[in-house]
């Protein structure tokens, strides 16, 4: 809810003290205090973050899991009783803080991850689930003939995305990676509404966060460039734990991460020094946790999948960024390369077709379509990167779907 709406509600309830020019969370806290004092049944929900001391708090996705005075306290006894873990989504009734307490506490737990309490008792832990190659494809083609749809159509042919894909978008600065991410997010939410989409923006500009929130129908979690590295790390850990809990409930989750390079830089600043420093100033232990984040993407045999599509920065002039990219290069099962030369010519999407592709694409695409794609690749291979993408874009602009595209190629 916008801040001005909260202030209007506060005015209706005659709350004036400490509300004007206060943070959004402080206004919510003041409203909850009045409502619970009057004996109203107040319900809260949020994503659990368990702290090292054993207790936890419900964090709000709208606030990008930032700690605030309106967070709900979860006691260690509740965590043990319901076998809760970081990332569980809880909802229930809250009570007013007792003397000496600072936070509202959850008195009655109604649901865990949207299911009754009994249903979440026998869930298999994420680490014990069996990872497989992706076998179900995301259709990114919307068949509406728009210029935005062409991005999805090219990806469907040249770098198909499956449920459980671990994809890396390799991009130099100003090559259109943010626009590409927006178009992929829109295509997934349009064609696959059952998928839980999370867009994770690390070290991004605030105006890009707002634009993403307004264009994408999904969770947008962010930590902007003016936040400390510890905050970037906390946000990333919360997002991956949330995704793991959803997969334990056999859901399909997609995380769009922009960018894994900045996340690795944040871990490099936070991790205690091991004394071993790689080229570019990267600590030897710093890349273990971002690799664990990226490595969580998998198709699960027992049901559910976690897809991570992450951007990696190259040609930034920083040796550290090159080292981070080299470390992640072989870990994904799909790579999409963006080219600065194509972007400078104002040709979008600036995809280097000959360098992009998906491993084991035969598991995602039917054999007759795969043969057509291979013939197209043979045709494009002798061309340079600009000629190849211009050829494909020219043919696609005259057709509304990929089936029609291959029909025109036959002629």
Swiss-Prot record:
Enzyme Commission designation: 3.6.4.-
Sequence positions that bind ATP: 162-167, 174-179, 205
Any GO BP: DNA-templated transcription termination
Signal sequence extent: none
Alphabetical keyword list: ATP-binding, Helicase, Hydrolase, Nucleotide-binding, RNA-binding, Transcription, Transcription regulation, Transcription termination
GO molecular function: ATP binding; ATP hydrolysis activity; ATP-dependent activity, acting on RNA; helicase activity; RNA binding
Cellular component terms (Gene Ontology): cytosol
Keyword flag Hydrolase: yes
Domain Rho RNA-BD, first and last residues per copy: 41-116
PROSITE patterns: RHO_RNA_BD
Record's subunit section: Homohexamer. The homohexamer assembles into an open ring structure.
PANTHER family linked: TRANSCRIPTION TERMINATION FACTOR RHO
Free-text function comment from the UniProt entry: Facilitates transcription termination by a mechanism that involves Rho binding to the nascent RNA, activation of Rho's RNA-dependent ATPase activity, and release of the mRNA from the DNA template.
NCBIfam families noted in UniProt: PRK09376.1, rho
Family: Belongs to the Rho family.
HAMAP family: Rho
Listed name of the protein: Transcription termination factor Rho
